[in-house]
Amino acid sequence: MTLINLFLALVLAVFELTTPVAAQRFDQVVRTDFFAGFAGDQARLQKGMAACETILAENPKHAEALVWHGAGLLFQAGLSLQAGDTQRGMELFQSGLGQMNAGITLQPDNVAVLIPRGAVLLTATRNMDPAVGRPLLEQAVADYEKVLGIQEAYFDTLGDHPRGELLFGLAEGSARLGRPEKARAYFERLIKDAPTSGQSKRADQWLKTGTLPKIVGTGCIGCHKP
């Protein structure tokens, strides 16, 4: 269940990284069902997927519904691959990735669209052959870098937890891409700007040793419940 737990952890963590104040966001409408589904409640996952499908039937260009539905498909792809159904898993993966990419194309500067794709790809690439996963990991880091650029104007108004999760994703992704200077800069900023995020110990270990503790179970240090 490691892949599922990692997927859940990152998605739960980064969906907090939105604008500091927002009206009823789309993710607030569907996320509890998706979070419960990612934790193993298939009925709740189907409820969340159905909500997205209803929105998309009315508006096929609803960017947030596309990325959420795409995230659900990628989660289902992971389940199929774990069950040994490679063909179905790859079909779901390609479909989910296509939906997430379509959402980004529609709203390339929307944090609530960028973050889901970045989060899912950061997690999914942990289990991929580097030759296949590297381009997707590069895209994930690019998504997070764009989010950071968008949020710089109000980054200090966000809590330590969302700041820490974004910076940790950037740092860890950069390290996995073989970009130690960038990784160091992000880890150092994490310790400075988000000292109580829960990721400071991991950042400090990397700065001292060049390695991170193995992520077992959930990767997010915060407290999230469906």
Residue ranges: model-predicted function:
Residues 62, 69, 88-89, 110, ...:
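Residues that mark the junctions of alpha-helical repeat units in TPR/alpha-solenoid scaffolds
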Residues 5-16:
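Bacterial N-terminal signal peptides
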Residues 26-28, 153, 157-164, 176-226:
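Terminal, low-structured helical/coil segments at or just beyond the last alpha-helical repeat
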